[in-house]
A protein has these predicted regions:
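Short linear interaction motifs
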Residues: 4-5, 73, 320-323
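Internal, well-ordered alpha/beta segment that forms a basic, Gly-enriched binding/recognition surface
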Residues: 83-187
């Protein structure tokens, strides 16, 4: 069995009571069958509490006010203190370690939903790389696992990460290239033409980011603008209006895991989407000006944006071996990262133009919790990338 993990993986150590939040609230923690049996046979004074605060039908810990029943007032776990760490279920033992399973391979990441894991990721200045180690285990075989597609996805992901990490190129062009390549790979899968993948990879690598590449992108954007050429359509296709529509397409579809999440979004985004124009002449609307101001005031975002894109692509891209949804996964990576940027700018404005690493960490882990702590949300978000016209290839090119 091969195990792959990011180079910063072993930097993680739980900070327990010093954590600004808790991983034991806002989501249902599923208990694995092996641990359930241990709980059933547990003896001692903690037995009654253990039995009463587990939903044995659903195989989850009960919750009170969205908090795990075993989470005490100090935000520490009573199972740990009363029964010992060996009584943790698989989820609690592993978190924030996230594992994607493939035949003969486990890909491990640190979930962005953990504040300390988010801090480690966002503090990385060097390009993230991945380490693979091998352990002797019983050979496994997955029924209907398309190994040919999987190896193509692995090679393609390496290429996409190389694109994201090319710091000689402005991020806008990297995002364009990322989307364009994923778009073409998806067409190949749709036509069952995997044999063309190598040709597509080479074409995108050779085309670089020069005038020819940019002219193709501009042509795609302009063709879409001509198709929607009325004054009303043009106004509705500005980056600001597109982002507003994207939020409106996503938020109502999501299960709310923590009370106050939608109010938090409103408070963050209202300063950014207030509809005014910049009082300074010829400097564009206030929206664009404020985003540029944030990027100048918080230069760390340049690298943090890269690290977030790599995080999403590494974690989810190769899952396309199970559903063929290549483009949707890349779209999701781009949209999630740009949504976080919008929340950054709104927070910067709300906080009187102050923004620090702690703000970035808080935004990232809260966003991740609402998305990644719910399979329903994660799956629905990805589905929306394909279902909703607002997330079209052309619209995403416009907001990069």
């Amino acid at each position: 069995m091969q195990y792959t993990f990011p180079n910063y993986y072993k930097e993680f150590s739980c900070i327990a009571g010093a954590c600004p939040d808790t991983c034991c609230a806002g989501w249902q923690i599923v208990i694995d069958d092996q641990t359930l049996k241990k709980y059933q046979h547990f003896k001692g004074p903690f037995r009654n509490r253990l039995h009463n605060d587990i939903d044995w039908k659903q195989h989850v810990f009960r919750q009170y006010n969205r908090r795990c029943a075993f989470l005490n007032e100090e935000n520490l776990c009573d199972i740990y203190t009363e029964a010992g760490p060996e009584m943790f279920c698989g989820t609690c033992k592993n978190y924030p370690r996230h594992i994607e399973e493939f035949e003969g391979l486990r890909e491990i990441s640190l979930s962005l939903s953990c504040p300390e894991a988010a801090r480690i990721l966002l503090s990385q200045k060097e390009k993230v790389h991945f380490i693979t180690k091998e352990k002797k285990t019983k050979e496994e075989v997955y029924d209907d696992f398309d190994y040919f597609l999987f190896t193509a996805l692995m090679d393609t992901r390496d290429m996409l990460i190389d694109i994201i990490q090319d710091r000689t190129v402005p991020m806008q062009k990297r995002l364009w290239k990322l989307l364009a390549a994923a778009h073409d790979f998806q067409l190949c899968v749709n036509k069952n033409e995997l044999f063309k993948w190598e040709e597509i990879r080479k074409r995108h690598e050779d085309s670089g980011y020069g005038d020819r590449f940019c002219s193709k992108i501009y042509s795609r954007i302009n063709a879409d603008n001509i198709e929607n050429s009325s004054a009303a359509s043009a106004c509705a296709n500005t980056p600001e209006q597109l982002f507003k529509k994207m939020w409106k397409a996503v938020v109502p579809e999501m299960e709310v895991l923590r009370p106050g999440w939608q109010k938090y979004l409103e408070n963050c985004l209202t300063p950014l989407y207030n509809g005014n124009t910049d009082p300074q002449p010829d400097s564009g609307n206030l929206y664009s000006w404020q985003k540029s101001e944030f990027d100048f005031s918080y230069p760390d975002w340049q690298i943090q944006e890269e690290q977030l894109l790599v995080y999403w692509i590494y974690t989810y891209f190769c899952g396309a071996v199970y559903d063929d949804e290549i483009f949707a996964k890349v779209k999701m990576a781009v949209v999630c990262t740009l949504f976080i940027h919008e929340l950054n700018v709104g927070t910067y404005l709300k906080n009187n133009r102050q923004f620090k690493l702690d703000d970035q960490i808080r935004i990232c882990y809260q966003f991740s919790r609402e998305l990644e702590h719910s399979d329903l949300n994660l799956n629905r978000f990805e589905e929306l990338m394909t279902e909703k016209e607002i997330f079209s290839f052309e619209n995403l090119l416009k907001i990069c």
